[in-house]
């Protein structure tokens, strides 16, 4: 008997067999757990991550920030709206290229990032306590390979 799936089968494939489904499921679970820990500061882990990326880059262009976060620009713009509304980030025209926009943290945003970092560290510690420090480090390395440009290129080549 063959292990090949039956085309048109009404039974969906096991999500643990599909790499994409397994990664999405794990991402949702980890996001839920981190969001719970970050809730007292009013941020979700996705918002915390955006603030971290902006802080590291200074005042990145939208294109550079989207690339660093592996997001398309429209998704980034959508995710920036609540951060801008709450006064954590400021959008401005690039002085060297008026067609491009840059984003930077406000003072309020820097304070919110400092507050969320403490909670994020707690979430990190909880993850490593539950999953194991060495396994967590190995997981981060494996995931870094997967979200690299080199992996995307190799994948697109088939």
Description of each model-found segment:
Residues 40-41, 54-57:
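Short helix-capping/hinge SLiMs at alpha-helix to coil transitions
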